Curated annotation (Swiss-Prot):
Designated name of the protein: DNA-directed RNA polymerase 19 kDa subunit
GO biological process entries: DNA-templated transcription
Disulfides per UniProt: none
Induction remark: Expressed in the early phase of the viral replicative cycle. Expression seems to continue throughout virus infection.
Entry GO terms, CC: DNA-directed RNA polymerase complex; virion component
Subunit structure and binding partners: The DNA-dependent RNA polymerase used for intermediate and late genes expression consists of eight subunits Rpo30/OPG66, Rpo7/OPG90, Rpo22/OPG103, Rpo147/OPG105, Rpo18/OPG119, Rpo19/OPG131, Rpo132/OPG151 and Rpo35/OPG156. The same holoenzyme, with the addition of the transcription-specificity factor OPG109, is used for early gene expression.
Highest taxon listed in the record's lineage: Viruses
Length: 164
């Protein structure tokens, strides 16, 4: 039991030493030299709703910017997309769809199907619609320069293969 009394006395002596140190530190510092700024330096926000509205309008602006980028990107056609349009158009012509060209005649029916498909795409009368970024787009909705660039590339390949 004597040992436990010594432990209790030891603990109480330590606590009083720390309490004495805290009191000495508090007495030594004044408000002017402390790390805490006086109340007069704090800014009072009149309403937090202005910050919320600013953040909301900023989010709207960012959302509109992303939508505009998406629309601009949607108008660019990739080589895979044009190849898919050509393949689907070829498939439908094989199954009996009539060509939608401006000068439809018996000569059109005798032409190579690839010539007819390219003519439909160049005239903008190709009936194939693809979905891109949630929008249904026809050949007319895409950038004409990009479309022409990819068609020329595909035609060069076909000419090398002696298909066109």
């Amino acid at each position: 039991m004597a040992d436990t009394d010594d432990i209790i006395d030891y603990e109480s002596d330590d606590l009083t030493e720390y309490e004495d140190d805290d009191e000495e530190e508090e007495d030594g510092e004044s408000l002017e030299t402390s790390d805490i700024d006086p109340k007069s330096s704090y800014k009072i926000v009149e309403s937090a709703s202005t910050h919320i509205e600013d953040a909301h309008s900023n989010l709207k602006h960012i959302g509109n910017h992303i939508s505009a980028l998406k629309r601009r990107y949607t108008r660019r056609i990739s080589l895979f997309e044009i190849a898919g349009i050509i393949a689907e158009s070829y498939n439908l012509l094989q199954r009996g769809r009539l060509p939608l060209v401006s000068e439809f005649s018996n000569e059109t029916m005798k032409q190579n199907m690839l010539h007819v498909i390219i003519q439909e795409i160049e005239e903008g009368s190709c009936p194939i619609v693809i979905e891109k970024n949630g929008e249904l787009l026809s050949v007319n909705d895409f950038d004409k320069d990009g479309l022409k660039f990819h068609l020329d590339y595909i035609i060069k390949i076909w000419k090398l293969q002696k298909r066109y």
